[in-house]
């Protein structure tokens, strides 16, 4: 399981802001997220526990980057006590965590944008999405491709990909997924409506946008950023003018 943190600090990393703890299973591309306030080690550990509890399959190994939120006694001790292998990315080798980095972009940044979130209300909305509609929509209805072969010929790189599947399909096709897990996933899938999930995601993103704008609109004199006009697209998040 690759793990990373996505900072919602906007244009400045001063003060306390929300961080999305993002986790991806390499074999199936299944993704889960959890928003925490700040980068505290104990909060990060609690987020990992919550994420692990929502995963449809068991964990064997966690592989974070080199941030102090993950490389610390609390996380290491938890991994040791729960019999998890603990590895980490090599310094300055961002591709070591390429799968979760892709999900950071697709499932977090492209959804909620690059602006600053730093309130409990915003945290509640993000986690409402991560715990419910967003995780269901991304894992059951958005396909991902696996790289099958990569060849270099005369200075050109040729890549061949496997047939695109959703994380749900990858898990259902995996012989290592238990029958109990497959039955639970199938039952959940049969009760989902992607159009309804999408509408609910858009409604919650709209509410998140309204809270963000109201936050800066009430503090114009103290914050120059609030004078900037933001446009909001519910499907992709905020975009600066």
Predicted regions and their residues:
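Residue-level recognition of single "structural anchor" positions
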Residues: 1-12, 55, 74-82, 91
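An active-site-proximal beta-strand-loop segment
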Residues: 1-31
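Short, conserved catalytic/metal-binding motifs centered on acidic residues
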Residues: 4, 29, 62-65, 138, ...
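Active-site beta-loop-alpha junctions of metal-dependent nucleic acid enzymes
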Residues: 24, 33-56
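RNase H-like two-metal-ion nuclease catalytic core shared by retroviral integrases
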Residues: 64-66, 70-79, 86-112, 125-127, ...
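Short, solvent-exposed helix-loop connector elements
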Residues: 111-127, 145-150
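Protein C-terminal end segments and domain termini
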Residues: 130, 163, 167-168, 180-184, ...
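Charged, gly/pro-enriched flexible loop segments at helix/strand junctions
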Residues: 132-168
């Amino acid at each position: 399981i690759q793990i990373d943190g996505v900072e919602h600090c906007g244009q400045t990393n001063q003060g306390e802001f929300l961080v999305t703890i993002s986790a991806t299973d390499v074999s199936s591309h299944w993704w889960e997220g959890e928003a925490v306030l700040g980068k505290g080690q104990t909060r990060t550990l609690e987020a990992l526990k919550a994420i692990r509890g929502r995963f449809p399959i068991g964990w064997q190994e966690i592989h974070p980057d080199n941030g102090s939120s993950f490389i610390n006694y609390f996380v290491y001790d938890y991994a040791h006590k729960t019999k998890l292998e603990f590895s980490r990315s090599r310094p300055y080798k961002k591709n070591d965590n390429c799968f979760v980095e892709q999900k950071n972009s697709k499932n977090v940044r492209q959804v909620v944008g690059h602006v600053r979130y730093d309130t409990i209300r915003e945290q509640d909305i993000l986690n409402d999405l991560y715990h419910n509609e967003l995780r269901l929509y991304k894992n059951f209805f958005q396909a991902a491709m696996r790289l099958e072969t990569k060849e270099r010929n005369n200075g050109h790189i040729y890549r061949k990909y496997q047939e695109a599947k959703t994380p749900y399909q990858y898990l259902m096709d995996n012989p290592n997924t238990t029958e109990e897990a497959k039955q639970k996933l199938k039952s959940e899938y049969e009760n989902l409506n992607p159009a309804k999930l999408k509408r609910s995601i858009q409604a919650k993103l709209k509410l998140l946008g309204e809270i963000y704008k109201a936050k800066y609109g009430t503090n114009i004199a103290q914050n120059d950023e609030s004078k900037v006009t933001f446009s909001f697209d519910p499907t992709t998040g905020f975009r600066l003018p």
